[in-house]
Amino acid sequence: MLRIADKTFDSHLFTGTGKFASSQLMVEAIRASGSQLVTLAMKRVDLRQHNDAILAPLIEAGVTLLPNTSGAKTAEEAIFAAQLAREALGTNWLKLEIHPDARWLLPDPIETLKAAEALVKQGFVVLPYCGADPVLCKRLEEVGCAAVMPLGAPIGSNQGLETKTMLEIIIQQATVPVVVDAGIGVPSHAAQALEMGADAVLVNTAIAVADDPVMMATAFRLAVEAGLLARQAVPGNRSTYASATSPLTGFLEALA
């Protein structure tokens, strides 16, 4: 069970809505993933119409919507987009994204922190997408963010947990949930994140661009469950030296 702010989730896999070939395929993949929290870019939906091709099936599916501010380049733009989303969707939950460079889509740490502080004061439940910077994540936590969402690698790159060392520090020091976001390309990346101690992962591109998104969504669901179970089971310690599982000493002595 995962708790963020005033909501609890059985699934530790969050999903996105971009890049799917159709709305129907998107919904089928989300259902297969077991995800209960789904992000959607406000620039891709008509917030005035609940029968929007993307929004309507999500509402029907009963998932928690997490509008994001993707496309915002400044704190001011993100705050304005957040206010529009709250008015249109009736939710104060927000994935805060500010990336001024469309080529790399890396989050702006200064604008993100500024916007996060302002939005928390306005009553938003803020989940900021940010770099894997332990100091920044701590600052975001201190201004009241409900979780932090550090990247594993650039958005849509499928590179995996390239920031593993920094993620480990963030996880160790965090007192709010840590959701690894961006760069997760295959289910084993998601399992690794949960094994490390992350509370959840957010996956979009890896599912949406797969030849079979529904099958890939299922694979991610199972991987997240496996990673969480492995962590709860408490793996054995790593060792430089070998340790035989079936020592021969007693056996050979008995034959002598």
From Swiss-Prot:
Name of this protein: Thiazole synthase
GO process terms (BP): thiamine diphosphate biosynthetic process
Annotated gene: thiG
Positions of 1-deoxy-D-xylulose 5-phosphate binding: 156, 182-183, 204-205
Gene3D superfamilies: Aldolase class I
Pfam families with a match to the protein in the record: ThiG
InterPro entries: Aldolase_TIM, Thiazole_synthase_ThiG, ThiG
Family designation: Belongs to the ThiG family.
